[in-house]
Amino acid sequence: MASRFRHAALVGKYQAPGSRQVLASVAEFLTNQGLEVSLDTTTAMAVGLPDYGALDAAQIGKHCDLAVVVGGDGTMLGTARQLARYGVPLIGINQGRLGFMTDIPMAEFRETIAPMIAGDYEEEHRTMLEGCVKRPSGDEFDVIYETFAVNDVVVSRGASAGMVELRVDVQDQFVANFRADGLIISSPTGSTAYALSAGGPILHPGISGWLMVPIAPHALSNRPIVLPDDSEVRIEIVAGRDASVNFDHQSLASLLHGDRICVRRSEHRVRVLHPRGWNFYATLRRKLHWNEGVLPDGAHS
């Protein structure tokens, strides 16, 4: 069967036990499928597979038409942030724990990926967040940090401090001042992550929206809210010491009073390839253990 792809980048969770052997077997499989295989530079330095070249993100974007990610959702998120701007599609093999985005079990990767490489797959596009931190400088604001996030942007209180007070504006319209342990702005992809544990709803990845979820708010009436994803959200630090902001766990600590975190939709989208027949609801059932102990097809005991 002819390959739909030509050159695959292989990205691995190199800290995991046995990762070198796992990555070597995936690389050999891809090569046997007729693909040229390169490792991303970080993976190559960590595992040392000399038979394969090493490419950085820009080189992957230029030379590769597929990226195969072996690891958990954290590895997948990091790769997605790096490669989304280049439009390289991702296939995720789960070597982690939950694996919402890395949906191919390690034990089944050969029989699952072979037809995908030949072009038999489902393609999904995931929205990304683009965020920056602005600091007051006279009458202006200087951008001191900017990056992308696939899951969420989280503003949190300091480790030794009490609650933070955050002013939130959406599309330059004042929403409220929140006193809480923090605030999550989540994409639909991130709605099954921190936002879910903080009491937010699950959003289908096809929904054009964000979640805004307070973390342990002082007022119980402060509830999660769904926002249109063409909105720019601005969060200002009003009170609280040592607050921090995390973009998919990329952290900027020691925010100051008056700092603003601005979040909007990125122009880039993450291309994710799934096996034929994949659907979001089956993933939820499997990962969240829904329907366990329930008789199938409405049967009665």
Swiss-Prot record:
Active-site residues, Swiss-Prot/TrEMBL: D73
Enzyme class: transferase
InterPro entries in the record: ATP-NAD_kinase_N, ATP-NAD_kinase_PpnK-typ_C, NAD/diacylglycerol_kinase_sf, NADK
Keywords annotated in UniProt: ATP-binding, Cytoplasm, Kinase, NAD, NADP, Nucleotide-binding, Transferase
Chief location category: cytoplasm
An example Gene Ontology molecular-function term: metal ion binding
Catalysed conversion reaction: NAD(+) + ATP = ADP + NADP(+) + H(+)
SUPFAM superfamilies: NAD kinase/diacylglycerol kinase-like
Key word Zinc present: no
Location relative to the cell: Cytoplasm
Cytoplasm found in the keyword field: yes
A GO CC term attached to the entry: cytoplasm
Top-rank taxon: Bacteria
Cofactor(s) named in the record: a divalent metal cation
EC number: 2.7.1.23
Short name of one Pfam family: NAD_kinase
HAMAP family documented for this protein: NAD_kinase (MF_00361)
Function, as annotated: Involved in the regulation of the intracellular balance of NAD and NADP, and is a key enzyme in the biosynthesis of NADP. Catalyzes specifically the phosphorylation on 2'-hydroxyl of the adenosine moiety of NAD to yield NADP.
Protein name as annotated: NAD kinase
Organism: Methylibium petroleiphilum (strain ATCC BAA-1232 / LMG 22953 / PM1)
